[in-house]
Design a protein with these regions (language model features):
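Short, solvent-exposed alpha-helical "recognition" segments
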Residues: 88-100
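General nucleic-acid-binding
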Residues: 1-30
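Recognition helix of helix-turn-helix/homeodomain-like DNA-binding domains
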Residues: 59, 84-91
Length: 112
């Protein structure tokens, strides 16, 4: 492995905003789905990736179907606590990133 010179931008930090910004920058680097999957595998445990994937799936189901929380729970096994959390972010939270991602993917929430 080739040696690299130290990056002057990399320094120990406990600042949550700086750490989050650095993570966001890293998450923007994959060029395709395979690269993103590899990055997620490096960053997250399999359980963490599964949790993220479940939240995304629930968001799509809530946005694109008339399924109830109970229906989603029974069909997916995702806890109702998680379903309620995702629903709150879809409806009330200012971020609206779930909806933005679905819009950019041309996704109304329905599975293919």
């Amino acid at each position: 492995m080739a040696e690299t010179s130290p990056d002057p931008e990399v320094a120990p930090s406990r600042d949550p905003a700086r750490l989050a910004a650095d993570l966001c920058s890293a998450l923007l680097t994959p060029r395709d789905e395979q690269e993103m999957a590899r990055l997620l595998a490096d960053l997250c445990t399999p359980a963490e990736v599964r949790t993220l994937a479940e939240r995304w799936h629930v968001a799509r189901l809530l946005a694109g179907t008339d399924l109830t929380y109970r229906d989603i729970h029974e069909a997916t096994g995702v806890s109702t606590t998680t379903i309620v959390r995702v629903a709150r972010f879809l409806r009330q939270e200012p971020y609206q990133a779930y909806r933005l991602a679905m819009q950019r993917l041309g996704d109304n929430g329905d599975d293919d």
